[in-house]
């Protein structure tokens, strides 16, 4: 049984590794303007993220640069990626710090669409008082896939 588990980990690890950002290049960065004390007037206000979201011209340029640098090498076109915030704007991630932005594939079991589900869950939990801002930020920045599996469930 141990051998089967080890084999599964070896086969699955490269796929999961690609879906996680490079921990050195993208450790995540927090927006200092968002704190636990002010979430009611920042992230928990409908439409607040629109006021701080960087323009597509900035994120597209960064995405192309990061893909070209090889940190996120892929045979696919840049249009198949979203330049995503590791710590989402919904939970106080920094909007423009490159340490919080990375090219994430749109599709796949742990693509950008799946991460969006986790971001929405964490945002609702923080704003409802079921989780602190720091807990949500730590969950997603340490390993967003593990957080997804814990909070949303595997294969959902």
Predicted regions and their residues:
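Nuclease and nuclease-like effector domains acting on nucleic acids or nucleotide cofactors
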Residues: 3-81, 90-156
